[in-house]
């Protein structure tokens, strides 16, 4: 093949003829019960999320979402991936979440729900990725240092 190329023009023509590899194809991942599963994490919280086609009922640790997450902001945060993907009310969501506080748990459920949606409908991946729902939020609490009152706050200083 190298012998057949005589000039740079022929090389550029050959380069154009070679096709670029296609984007990776994502498959639908569903268990025998027709549910998609994913794990989401945020701070110290870990959420295990299952989704299946249904009426839009969201259950967190065997309790309704309104009972478990009383603050409307947290509920809105969890429902964001469904709203962005235009799938609100089409899937039943069952999740178990442990560790951390309510804000971290809501973030973990949101992350897991986004991943489960992409497992159920791979074509939603680009929409959710663009919205930043598939990216793990890696921010965690900064550790306390010795010689300091907290992570960065110093002890009170007295000149005299």
UniProtKB/Swiss-Prot annotation:
GO biological process: translation
Highest taxon of the lineage: Bacteria
Record flagged with keyword Nuclease: no
Keyword line: Ribonucleoprotein, Ribosomal protein
GO terms under cellular component: cytosolic small ribosomal subunit
SUPFAM superfamilies: Ribosomal protein S5 domain 2-like
UniProt keyword annotation of Glycoprotein present: no
Gene3D superfamilies in UniProt: 3.30.230.10
Pfam families, sorted: Ribosomal_S9 (PF00380)
GO molecular function: RNA binding; structural constituent of ribosome
Coiled-coil region(s): none
Matches recorded under NCBIfam families: PRK00132.1
Family: Belongs to the universal ribosomal protein uS9 family.
UniProt cross-references to HAMAP family, sorted A to Z: Ribosomal_uS9_B
Protein name (database record): Small ribosomal subunit protein uS9
Protein source organism: Bradyrhizobium sp. (strain ORS 278)
Gene transcribed to yield this protein: rpsI
